[in-house]
Amino acid sequence: MEQTGRLTLPTDADVVAETLRLKNLLGADALRDCDGTEMPKELLTDPAKKYATYYTTRKDNAWAEANPDEVQQEYLISDRHTARGTKLRIHLMGGFHTQQLKVNTLDDPKRWWEVIDRTTGEVVPTDKWFFDEPTGEVEIETVPYHEYTVSFLAFLIWDPVHMYNFLTNDWKDTPHQLTYDVRQPKTQAYVKEKLRRWCEANPHIDVVRFTTFFHQFTLTFDDQKREKFVEWFGYSASVSPYILEKFEKWAGYKFRPEFIVDQGYHNTMFRVPSKEFRDFIEFQQQEVCKLAKEMVDIVHSYGKEAMMFLGDHWIGTEPYGKYFASIGLDAVVGSVGSGVTLRMISDIKGVKYTEGRLLPYFFPDVFTEGGDPIGEARTNWMKARRAILRSPLDRIGYGGYLKLASNWPGFIDEIQNVVGEFRQIHENMQGTKSYVAPFKVAILNCWGGLRKWMSNQVHHSIYHRETYSAEGVLECLSGMPFDVEFIDFDDIRSGIPKDIGVIINVGDAYTAFSGAENWIDEKVVTAIRKFVDEGGGFIGVGEPTACQHQGRYFQLSDVMGVDREMGFSLSTDKYNTCDPHHFILEDIDTAVDFGEGTSRIYAQGKHYQILAQDGEYSQLVVNEYGKGHSVYFAGLPYSPQNCRILLRAIYYAAGMPEEMKHYYVTNVDTEVTVFPETKRIAVINNADAEEKTDLYIKGHLIDSLTLAPREMRWVDDAE
């Protein structure tokens, strides 16, 4: 078995001896510094690979202070204010933290700002308002009792990630780091030359770990230093008059701040992206990837590898976009908080290797009294392990303060187990693919392939009550035996690919993930009806196909056999009876967890079967539609049992229930992954208790296993 390699450990100046001890104990072959730590000089000659975290946009306050016009900027929108007369004054920085943000008074407000009457949606003419710089207020000529907002540019005078780390770690004497805009001419030339000098001065560094390139995801703090707005996918801080003038020339139309602030929603992933915002993302991808390639080329010219951290200043790189591979990166590394976020990294193409930074991060917010770093490591690994078996990372690692991890009783033992299992997976798979079903599963939403494994997320692996019942679908799929595609509605209009067996639509009504007005396009609904009628499968979760139109809320209510009562059809009686006896629930002994669920779902039609109900309303319904099948879930949070239910639902919807038992384990807390080329089978226990399970291949009992808590057992494929 592999005893060394595939592991990166953090280090710092005060833990040299401990770094070497753990490097040898865990078999690490790479060392890294982190934000707030430094690579010890004593380790520069160690044979391990050395990663250096490199910041293109910060850690040079002297440059930022000397060039205030090229500090990074963000579009902000003021709070809504109601006019009670014909004049209204709005204080722009109300609710924002003035140590992080500063109003841009260098560029013409009448050119780059926008005042909007939010009652009518009309733009207030520029001669009807003015900016009073001494007070920081905008005075507006108003219509009484109309609401108004001001969209404006602000300088980011404290890097958001540095601010987050500063507050999280309670740093006291660390200067606030300004963030400068590498896209602008003076700074771009300076940063390129600075990178060359850095490469020359650091010959012992093997890997330049860009953290990241040029634009931070939107991370805005309020006036009490709390997070005010966080959008891991947000483009609001990727703007400046310089960039926007270039965009106008590229796009052929005038830019508006509303394209970014989006009524105050800031184009979160949940919003159906407008044409203008899609254009902006396309433009930013082209420009960011082109400049990133220039930075990578500099690194390569010094014989070093270039690695990108998928996070922080990653905006514009879009790893699943059509320009990412042109950057020429050697590797991508990202934070792994779940199976979904692991697949977000491991499925990236166009790099030589991928690396996952496992949780917990070695920061005091976890390694403290009342914290449970061992429990977090176990939970994180059980989710990550499922996904690795399907789409493996090449490497794993950790970040933060090593001494916190080293001093926590039992934590290093837990890491030793994780690293050992990770190496076992690679040893047994030997670079081959795991078995998958003979059809593909497609996730349908407005983002499609640009945002693979990113659906229904508010922030990176952060729990939200409003989303966990939908996020569970992707989390389950991340470790399942299916090739998963991500398609958008234009893909449906162009023709559903022949290799897709099941389409899944999951999300809340009118979000980008459900689809909103796309569902009143006859080309979309007729294409999917035809697909299912001819034998395809459709699975809906939450409010799939939802858009009130022509007497229906779910536009494919005929396909799914369900609709949602919106109050309009209460006078129509519904007679729904539950019958839980079905292939989908054959393994299930306990009640199904639908999470927050979706209320007022009723079955309708002639070919449905209700498998679970909440009072008179339905939670799990199957339906026959021509030669095809559909399944509706009111919600589906991640759990081992729900993974089994979804597995069965997909095979049922595809019309191939017998195929599910090609490789099969009986206990719902266990799963099986098969590598046909190496004839090795992994059976994993996803529970914290001992579990017994039977392994079947093509209907034949191969083995009866008793698995320890969280165990992964390897057996030979006897087929």
Question: What positions do the PLM features span?
Answer:
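Noncatalytic N-terminal accessory/assembly modules of large enzymes
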Residues: 2-58, 65-97
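Catalytic domains of carbohydrate-active enzymes, especially glycoside hydrolases
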Residues: 8, 13-49, 195-209, 331-332, ...
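Hydrophobic targeting/anchoring helices
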Residues: 26, 62-64, 195-196, 209-213, ...
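Polysaccharide-binding and catalytic clefts of secreted carbohydrate-active enzymes
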Residues: 68-326, 344
